Swiss-Prot record:
Residues carrying N6-(pyridoxal phosphate)lysine: 233
Subunit note: Homodimer.
Stretches with biased composition (Basic and acidic residues): 9-22
Pathway: Amino-acid biosynthesis; L-histidine biosynthesis; L-histidine from 5-phospho-alpha-D-ribose 1-diphosphate: step 7/9
Keywords of this entry: Amino-acid biosynthesis, Aminotransferase, Histidine biosynthesis, Pyridoxal phosphate, Transferase
Listed GO biological process terms: L-histidine biosynthetic process
Protein name: Histidinol-phosphate aminotransferase
Organism (species): Mycobacterium marinum (strain ATCC BAA-535 / M)
Entry's EC annotation: 2.6.1.9
Length: 382
């Protein structure tokens, strides 16, 4: 006689850490839809020359896959330093650069080294939602304070809370995700003057910003400032999973204490180096995306939506009567955007022109419904 199959265990059946119970994993919806504007990728695919270079580079590396990779990724860090020197105008050496599997691993290593039990991290919300998740995962106390009306950073309020709470880690995202504003070097200097620990300036969208990179301040604040970046956004290398940081060499020495051995594969290293060799071609799309972002913003404003001025490759817009319902209405029309959890607002990545047109047509239809702001109008669709 066949016994009944045992029920599959659930999380409740496992000896999970108590602080993880009831939590949900991070992640944007992955759905097969005609228009995907929800994860802020560069919509322009790699050039054939870049594809060929990656294939050749990986093929050459494959003969040594029986060996561990360069654990310190010196060649890749040298190429990243050369790129940053050209892009920011600040001379950077490989000893100032560290790389990992996406900027999230970089952030995790930073919190492992400078956060932890008995230590505190502060963020100004709404901002990148992985900052509190990584803080929780490293047992760093997370403290958040609201941004100003309009979602900008109130630097005076930020200085006050940092001076009062004396955190070990401060997060500033510039341009800020999901709201889009950059922070000036003058404002960062004011904050750095009072930060007791380290200030992490998250420049994931730095190539889109109208403000200079904070890497120019590292020499002035070597023990307080670290700048994190990624190749997942402007660099159109999201599938390659490569993040990096710029800091004084001593800070990188600290990360060597917590990094996993051989954390960055040979394949990732050579593929990223190939992408860097084609940086000029890839980043040529940045100006196009900025122009499209401005076109989309103007059209949305013309329909009556409130559009938050953006310095990145996305726009935050509202004010919807019911943002989750509006998100579903976009999805029903084949357009996937992001509900970032801000009441009344949704975020849309800047895509290719035809993708943006499809998004604007869907927006015009929603502007004529009871989900839209009171002042919204369908006028202005392409």
């Amino acid at each position: 006689m066949t016994s009944a199959p045992r029920p599959r265990p659930t999380l409740d059946d496992l000896p999970l850490r108590e602080d993880l119970r009831g939590k949900s994993p991070y992640g944007a919806p992955q759905l097969a839809v005609p228009v995907r504007l929800n994860t802020n990728e560069n919509p322009h695919p790699p050039t054939q020359a870049l594809v060929d270079d990656v294939v050749r580079s990986v093929g050459e590396a494959a003969v040594d896959l029986h060996r561990y990779p360069d654990r310190d990724a010196v060649a890749l860090r040298t190429d990243l330093a050369n790129y940053l020197t050209a892009q920011t105008g600040t001379r950077i050496g490989f000893e100032n650069v560290w790389a990992a599997n996406g900027s999230n691993e970089i952030l995790q290593q930073l919190l492992q080294a400078f956060g932890g039990p008995g230590r505190t991290a502060i963020g100004f919300v709404p901002s990148y939602s992985m900052h509190p998740i990584i803080s929780d995962g490293t047992h760093t106390e997370w403290v958040e304070t609201a941004r100003a009306d309009g979602f900008g950073l109130d630097i005076d309020a930020a200085i006050a809370v940092v001076s009062d709470r004396r955190p070990d880690v401060v997060f500033i995202t510039s341009p800020n995700n999901p709201t889009g504003q950059s922070v000036s070097l003058t404002e960062l200097r004011r904050l750095l003057d009072v930060v007791p620990g380290i200030l992490i300036v998250d420049e994931a969208y730095g190539e889109f910003s109208s403000q200079p990179s904070a890497v120019g301040l590292i020499e002035e604040y070597p023990t307080r400032l670290v700048v994190t970046r990624t190749m997942s956004k402007a660099f159109a290398f999201a599938g390659g999973r490569l993040g990096y940081l710029v800091a004084t060499p001593a800070l990188i020495d600290a990360l060597l204490l917590v990094r996993l051995p051989y954390h960055l594969s040979s394949v990732t290293q050579v593929a990223a180096r190939a992408a860097l060799r084609h940086a000029q071609d890839t980043l040529g799309s940045v100006a196009t995306l900025i122009a499209e972002r401005e076109r989309v913003s103007k059209k949305l404003a013309g329909m009556g939506f409130r559009v938050i001025p953006s310095d990145a490759n996305f726009v935050l817009f509202g004010e919807f009567a019911d943002a989750p319902a509006a998100w579903q209405r976009y999805l029903d029309q084949g357009v996937l955007i992001r509900d970032v959890g801000i009441p009344g607002y949704l975020r849309a990545t800047t895509g290719l022109a035809d993708e943006n047109d499809a998004f604007l047509r869907a927006s015009a239809r929603i502007a004529a419904t009871d989900l839209a702001p009171a002042a919204a109008s369908p006028v202005g669709a392409p």
